[in-house]
Amino acid sequence: IFESIPGVSVRYVKRASQLGNPDLILLPGTKNTMSDLAWMRQSGMEAAVLKAHAAGCPIFGICGGYQMLGEELSDPSGVEEGGTMRGMGLLPMHTFFTEEKTRTRVNGQFLQVKGDLSGLSGAAFSGYEIHMGQSVSDGNLSMLTKISDHCNHADHTYDGIADSGSKTLSQNNGAMEKCEGAMAENVMKRNSNSGMEIRELPEGARQSE
């Protein structure tokens, strides 16, 4: 999505020294959240991302990247590494891995959103949800979306969270594409349309090193 937007450049980063000063950092999905978070921690990538966040850079987490942003990851059944692991601590939530994998189509609507996603408030979307485990919020966070149905079964659940300034954002389903487009547009406006640079950690970066 980002790569198709004029004025936006995307760079895939495998080393902390390559991170630089981007306008946005995207943590993508992964098939092994705990193992890849351990790689980020050992390589210095986590520290570099946290430093950028402290300086005001928005962080966007998708799927496994979403799970990394919380306080703790717990894997009592050994689905991934087993045991527990400290998260990046950017969002007050815990993730619990389970053996059951969720795969479903979803329809929903954005709630009232602040910051770089404010233009999406009230917009409808459709997409998919695929993940293992559940992420549970421990604090007063802004919800991004309301899911009206899973495979046409209404249950009105909520998905995606953001901190108070929408500087740390997490999304677990098909609303991701609209989020990416809106973030690019708003960050470019904030930078007087001078262009935007995004750093994205590639999926499975640990294994490809």
Where are these regions (language model features)?
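Short helix-loop-beta junction
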Residues: I1-R11
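Terminal amphipathic helices with adjacent charged low-complexity linkers/tails
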Residues: G20-P22, L27
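Polybasic, lysine-rich low-complexity intrinsically disordered segments
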Residues: N172, K178, N186-N191
